[in-house]
Amino acid sequence: MQIYLANPRGFCAGVDRAIAIVNEALARFEPPIYVRHEVVHNKFVVSDLANRGAVFVEELHEVPDGSIVIFSAHGVSKAVEDEAERRDLTVFDATCPLVTKVHIEVAKFAREKMDAVLIGHQGHPEVEGTMGRFSAQYGGEIHLVENEADVEKLEVSDPDRLAFVTQTTLSMDDTAVVIDALRKKFPNIQGPRKDDICYATQNRQDAVKDLAQRCEVVLVVGSPNSSNSNRLRELAERMNCKAYLIDNAGEMKKEWFAGVGAVGVTAGASAPEILIQEVLNQLQQWGGDLPDELKGIEENVTFSLPKELRIPVKEVGL
């Protein structure tokens, strides 16, 4: 059985930065360090950080006054940010800079008294944070749509003063369909100057398409609550591959590969390489060949840590 390995795969710059922020905070300051929401959507990563003193909470009321809290890579609403300031919490913001870019766009549209449309999945923390960056005090409104049916039902106050943004981890193909529907219904709708789908999401989706053309089965290493990992699985399935989303090698079943000539392995943007290697090892134990790593786009994007975590502790004033 041939094994093909997607490239790029796994950690993106935003995830690297978010995990580094938690690690640096734990190294500089004594636990507990509170983290609002899972810093990234991966069970292995979250469990490892929790074992070293990170305390994961869903809401700020679970964080004692005066504590250190880290916002997850998915971003938070303005209301959450304001609450942290009121309660004298020391905040290290691990929001991915590409998500922050969308926050800035939404806030700008609000100030310009426009309505905004967010293409995204209801209930996802990134969507909640972005929706919460739109201030209705200027008279506009933000609307959430997931698909063409939502666009068909959408009503806005002024179709000529309308703009859209997207969640960063969506399927490019699905998003293009929704954008086309928006432009058809609202010909004067404005879009972002640059596509909101992040570079890592796009690169990993391109890589899984390459993988699916060569394989009968595709394994996506990632947690069930990872949006970008789910999109990779769906994309492989659309290309007539059997595709499985797995947290780790222990979730694989040998019967998945009975009679299979080629299997592909990729990983979502929040899955660490160690989990990918464990999957490859298990496949080889079941008779797979040495993995063939496919060529792909080389990623050299990096994001710096907050300045408070780059200077000596005594200068931070904590």
Swiss-Prot record:
- InterPro entries recorded: LytB/IspH
Keyword check for Chloroplast: no
* Alphabetical list of Gene3D superfamilies matching this protein: 3.40.50.11270, 4-hydroxy-3-methylbut-2-enyl diphosphate reductase, catalytic domain
A Gene Ontology annotation in the biological process aspect, one of them, is: terpenoid biosynthetic process
Q: Where on this chain does (2E)-4-hydroxy-3-methylbut-2-enyl diphosphate bind?
A: H41, H74, H124, T168, S226, S227, N228, S270
Residues that hold dimethylallyl diphosphate according to the record: H41, H74, H124, S226, S227, N228, S270
Q: Where does [4Fe-4S] cluster bind?
A: C12, C96, C198
What detail does the entry give on cofactor binding? Binds 1 [4Fe-4S] cluster per subunit.
**Is Metal-binding among the key words of this record?**
yes
What family does the entry list? Belongs to the IspH family.
Q: What is the protein name given in its UniProt record?
A: 4-hydroxy-3-methylbut-2-enyl diphosphate reductase
User: Species name for this entry?
Assistant: Psychrobacter sp. (strain PRwf-1)
Output the lineage of the source organism: Bacteria, Pseudomonadati, Pseudomonadota, Gammaproteobacteria, Moraxellales
Which gene is the coding source of this polypeptide chain? ispH
